[in-house]
């Protein structure tokens, strides 16, 4: 059930992200679980801070989406961070390794645990 749910979430995310405005995009996906006593709103608040940081310090073209389960385990969720190209993704990783961004990383660890991640290149079907 867990694998089916994850497959559905990934498929829905890719369908959404495969629009022409995301042609040849780089997408980082993270499969995560809420820590005990935390809510999705807690994670979304931290993710908003993360997005604001990368938009201000790297590129305004970075988009982050939060995927929650429609059915099944509501504690499992995913992030899909979309970058216009691999160079922007690499610049983001460098920016996130800075001391200024370490506080945001700690905030994620306080509310969630991410067990999987993947970096995808999306190409439109012709």
Model-derived features with residue positions:
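Short amphipathic alpha-helices within nucleic acid-binding modules
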Residues: 40-42, 84-95
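Short amphipathic alpha-helical segments
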Residues: 38-63
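Bacterial N-terminal signal peptides that target proteins for export
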Residues: 1-9
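Structural beta->alpha junctions
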Residues: 34-37, 83
